[in-house]
Amino acid sequence: MKKLLFFVMVGLLALSGTLVSAQGGDLPALDELSEGWNELRPGGETICSNGTEYAFYVRPGDSDKLLIYFNGGGACWFGQICDLNAHPTYVPVVETDHNNPATHVGIFELDNPENPFADWSMVYVSYCTADVHIGDAVVTYDVPASDDMEAHQVTINHKGYANAMSALDWTFANYDAPKTIFVTGSSAGAIASPFYAGLVADEYPEARIVQLGDAAGGYHGEEVQAPLSAWNTISILPDWPEYDEVTADGLSFEDLYVATALHTDNVTMAQYNAAEDETQYGFLSLVGIADPLPQLLDEAYQTIESQSGEELYTYTAGGELHTILRRPEFYTYEVGGVRFVDWVASLVAGEDVGDVMCDVCDVAPNAE
């Protein structure tokens, strides 16, 4: 069995990089922000899983080009993996380098001349609610007794929707008419990205919008209904006819792609995955799905395209590496003669990129 890369917090890491913080009351407008990354703490209903304060981040840039990024950081939906003293599988707080864009590389390497997003405006939706940004619930989970602890309960604030919408509401109020918008996310954020791309399209119907999910395409199966039910995701679905037939016991991650594709006419949808992604295998095991990841990816891709009637552009690399957008491999991975950075740049430019698929899928591109 593949080893699950747990997102265990063993201590709070100090934020590094240059951040300007704004906290409480009315958030500053775009023209009041400093250069570089600004930390905004919206307050109100926003909250992290353990009750600590939430924050998102903004980096001013070209207002015609807007990047909205949903960070990853695991998830939980039953006691043993929600309890920070047991086997946690998520990041519970904002105050960690994991949620600090100033510490990331890849698309956040702003001084790299190959970065297609170097001059873009960026909104970074940090993540600390263990619900892949699409929860609206406060849940008390039972944690059974183990060798080193008695049975007990743990309460988790699955308020990812409130947190994400605080960032989007600020964005909608401060960016009037961006021409091109890249809505993306890694891991947990990848799952949420098609859902929020649809809401962004409703706000900016004249913009050209590109969505890319980074490393979460394999969660295909009815077993995912357990976490979606725990997070009360059905309650956040917008009042679109495309969701009329979706029920709480039938909701899938593919539905988020299909509904947005059917609802909009200005969104291009795409995914990146590694064919043997170690972390996807780990979470698949937790939900009870044992099928090979390449099979699940293929089935999910086909489901999205057949139900939406739209093309889903995919780039599937070999190997086990989980996520790419925040990593140096964003610039180095090459499959079938196509570098990933070039594929993304062409995708965002509105070009027909086609699908890219590994020939040797059990090793990473730089190991072929």
What kind of feature is each model-predicted range?
Residues 18-21:
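Sec/Tat signal peptide C-region and signal peptidase I cleavage site
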Residues 23-368:
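C-terminal His-loop and adjacent cap/lid subdomain of alpha/beta-hydrolase
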Residues 7-16:
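Bacterial N-terminal signal peptides
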Residues 1-4:
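Positively charged n-region of N-terminal signal peptides that target proteins for export
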